[in-house]
Amino acid sequence: YISFREAIPCGTAVEDDPAIGTGSTVYDEATKTYYTFYTGHKATEPREVILLATSKDCKTWTKDRSFRLSAPIEAGYDKNEFRDPYVFYDATAQCYRMLVSALKNGDGYIIEFTSTNLHDWDLKPEPFFNNIWGRFYECPDVFQMGSYWYMVYSSQGTKNEPAVVQYFYAQTLEELKGIAVENGQFPTSVPHEGWLDGVSFYAGKTAGDDTNRYLWGWCPTREGQKTTGTKSWAGALVAHRLIQNGDGTLSLDVPQAISAKYSQSVTLTEKTKVGDVTVSTSSYTLKANSFVRFARLRNRNKITMTATIPEENEAVFGLSFVDCSDKAEKARIFIEDKYNFLKLKEVEVNEKTGEWNDAGAITERAITPAADNVYHIEVYTEESVCVVYINGRYAFTNRIYDLAKNPWAIFCTEGEVTVSDIKLSTY
């Protein structure tokens, strides 16, 4: 991509936007003008309002200070929690729709405004999504893909639930607005409660061209620059390609341009084998409490491999990073074919026996095991950001400090797995 640097600058301390939050851009064919609606955030009340900037070329932007949309307090919405405007054109209704994350009586809602001219907005009496769980839903994003409509959003989470990017889908926009939520349960038509990644990917927004649609979000830094540290409210941009399955559900895969960028081949150098490991020409077969360590990674790495589990068998295996012989703690990504999960854990591993002490997951996400027992794995790393793709279906983003320029390994903790065709590349 090409960076055009800062597009819309923050305002002064006495204006509505000394800090700027996310929004969306829409093109008005009639006026040949781009409209970006964004969140203005400040310390004094009302803390958040919706603001506007316009452009003729989508590069040079001018703030329209005549536009200011505040929370509809007359309808009971909180004046301080009103953000993340998403605007799209509804060709059927011949109007623009704006979705905004809002709060009412302590519960989160995605509310809706409509307009025919992008300047005057009317509040719809019913929310776009009536959030029965009360969670605060941020960054709403609605789009049509093929014959389905989708809403992608970021659930801020609660004390007992993580913050994640999720989605709903339906065959029409009206059905999407009235998505059936029964007995407090997530719609059964959406597997794994609509999780699109793990808890280290947030604030996902989408955009597409004539061929593909992509999902961008950020992978947070962690306090103390420790893999186990508390997530910070900042991070690195991560992009996924959205894959629409035949039944309308969504999967994630690597964008082709990112995959192609890692074009410089790197020689795979084995350093150590521990435990029950059988080596053939292009594969390793590992059993419980075994691992194979390889030489230090670069700053930017692509790792591809195929993992096969014997028929009528179940296994737990994965990749280990910061896998140093003089350091007991390893950052392991567990592919739990046996338990239907992907997990990141920092665990202690015995260098002589391969035995390890279990620990709680730093991040995790549910998956459906491969029906044919075969896992095609692609890993992309840049400095401390690590994204794992499984079978072109699941994405698992994490922050792993000290990953770069340190050894890595493949391992098995339960059952048996054969890992073949391991390839490394960089850019």
Report each predicted region and the residues it spans:
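Carbohydrate-active catalytic/glycan-binding domains of CAZyme proteins
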Residues: 1-418, 423-427
